[in-house]
UniProtKB/Swiss-Prot annotation:
The keyword Transferase does not apply. It comes from Alopias vulpinus (Common thresher shark). Its main location: secreted. The gene is WNT-5A. GO terms for molecular function: cytokine activity; frizzled binding. Keywords: Developmental protein, Disulfide bond, Extracellular matrix, Glycoprotein, Lipoprotein, Secreted, Wnt signaling pathway. Glycans are attached at N69, N83. This is Protein Wnt-5a. Disulfide bonds join C82-C97. Ligand for members of the frizzled family of seven transmembrane receptors. Can activate or inhibit canonical Wnt signaling, depending on receptor context. Required during embryogenesis for extension of the primary anterior-posterior axis.
Length: 116
């Protein structure tokens, strides 16, 4: 009698958060490139390491999303409400792009429909 072993391999996407974090890290460390006289891509700043095939590169600068720009559809961040204590995307430090922000307190009175 003979024995047989069976192996099954498959590809599976990584956790969405991990993929997003990896892409953001690559975006933040992308290398600026330009076309030289021969039409070949070369680094704008040669002090940095040459990008590998796994790195992101770019030719055009990303728009400044802090400033309103109708051609890109960006509404900017001026006048938006931010969360002073948050370190996330809704936090004032990130959303206000270093321009500072106004602070205010609001007192609201609401009926609570409490029963005693």
């Amino acid at each position: 009698s003979g024995s047989c072993s069976l192996k099954t391999c498959w590809l599976q996407l990584a956790d969405f958060r991990k993929v997003g974090n990896a892409l953001k890290e690559k975006y933040d460390s992308a290398t600026a490139m330009k076309l030289n006289g021969r039409g070949k891509l070369v680094q704008v700043n040669s002090r940095f390491n040459t990008p590998t095939t796994l790195d992101l590169v770019y030719v055009d600068q990303s728009p400044d999303y802090c400033v309103r720009n109708e051609s890109t559809g960006s509404l900017g961040t001026q006048g938006r409400l931010c969360n002073k204590t948050s370190e996330g995307m809704d936090g004032c430090a990130l959303m206000c792009c270093g321009r500072g922000y106004d602070q205010f307190k609001t007192v609201r009175t609401e009926r609570c429909h409490c029963k005693f």
